From Swiss-Prot:
This is N-(2-amino-2-carboxyethyl)-L-glutamate synthase. The gene is sbnA. One of its GO terms (biological process) is cysteine biosynthetic process from serine. The modification N6-(pyridoxal phosphate)lysine is found at residue 43. Homodimer. Pyridoxal 5'-phosphate binds at residues 73, 181-185, 268. Catalyzes the synthesis of N-((2S)-2-amino-2-carboxyethyl)-L-glutamate (ACEGA) from O-phospho-L-serine and L-glutamate. Belongs to the cysteine synthase/cystathionine beta-synthase family. SbnA subfamily.
């Protein structure tokens, strides 16, 4: 099949059994490789879905200025889609944006609007949204994607990965285990799969320091999981359990995934691996689990896959100062893991 544009290559990602990480006699774990989308992440799906439906219905006009609060994957996905659709795009970002993501956005020609003031939760999300509202007020024709409250976010995953997983598996899964941030992914896929498998148990994987499920805000560094603000989309009734994973454990989960499966994935994928480990540790029977690996590891070379960064995170968790070479706390290097 010949695609008309790179946007038409979004979706249809493979579902892979993680048979080297998990013994099939104790668990079958299937992971959808969303990092294989053209712009490198699961966020390609809502970016395409929201833009194309907006253009089709007229809520987005040709040449419209699209604005979104994102320092990561959605910003990159929107930059790609807007480039193909002839739209102008500005990403509202904060100081936590990685140098790699900033360079990618600029390569796509995206505008960059940066905030520096922290919000009431100690993060930047509220401040970024405030800046978005200011931009909309000064440019009435602009359109805010609003991944936190736009129902087309979860609809894109309902009709995307949800449909694809339902078609791919020959029998029901016991659990859906997914990282959560805006909550669009987990809600969309859970709602679709529960049509097929009403007994499906949905487990959200959240970051330590995230406020999504009522915990107090705290420091966290990895993007793509957790939030400093509860999104309008979040419906806790669709979620059965929540597992919190900190940055260090998530990074170690990524390294295990790379070591055992050869899958070079981003931080939230490692958090999911850790969550599945915890679930299986208390399982009383073999389980069939479905998950997603949302993005590529290349965007985390300065964090998850950097030994000095990992040593700093380990020191913070231990409450002291430590380097990667410190004898007081052994932090395995990437070479040791591999």
């Amino acid at each position: 099949m010949i695609a008309k544009s790179i946007v038409d290559c979004i979706g249809g990602t493979p579902l892979v059994q993680l048979a080297r990480l998990y013994d099939g006699r104790k668990a079958e774990v299937f992971a959808k490789l969303e990092m294989l989308n053209p712009a490198g992440s699961i966020k390609d799906r809502p970016a395409r879905y929201i833009i194309e439906r907006g253009l089709a219905e007229g809520s987005i006009a040709p040449g419209t200025h699209i604005i979104e609060s994102s320092s990561g994957n959605l910003a990159i996905a929107l930059a790609m889609v807007c480039r193909i659709k002839g739209l102008r795009f500005t990403a509202v970002v904060d100081p936590k944006i990685s140098p790699t993501n900033l360079k990618i956005l600029r390569c796509y020609g995206a505008g960059i609007e940066r905030v520096t003031r922290k919000d009431s939760q100690g993060g930047y999300l509220e401040t970024r949204i405030e800046r978005v509202r200011q931009m909309l007020a000064s440019e009435p024709g602009a359109v805010w994607i609003n991944q936190y409250g736009n129902p087309r976010n979860w609809e894109s995953h309902f009709h995307g990965e949800g449909d694809e997983i339902a078609r791919a598996l020959d029998r029901p899964a016991d659990m859906l285990v997914l990282g959560v941030s805006t909550s669009g992914t987990v809600l969309g896929i859970a709602r679709r799969l529960r049509r097929e498998w009403p007994g499906l148990r949905v487990v959200a994987v959240d970051a330590v320091g995230s406020v999504l499920f009522g915990a107090k805000p705290g420091p966290r560094e990895l993007p793509g999981i957790g939030a400093s603000r509860v999104p309008e989309l979040l419906c806790r009734d669709d979620i059965d359990d929540v597992i919190h994973v900190d940055d260090y454990d998530a990074a170690m989960g990524c390294r295990r995934l790379l070591e055992r499966e050869g899958i070079f994935a981003g931080g939230s994928s490692g958090a999911v691996v850790v969550a599945i480990d915890r679930l299986l540790a208390r399982a009383t029977r073999p389980l069939r689990i479905v998950t997603l690996l949302p993005d590529r590891g290349e965007r985390y070379l300065d964090s998850v896959y950097d030994d000095e960064w990992l040593a700093r995170i380990a020191a913070s968790r231990a409450g002291g100062a430590v380097s990667a070479a410190s004898p007081s706390l052994h932090v395995p290097s990437l070479e040791e893991v591999l």
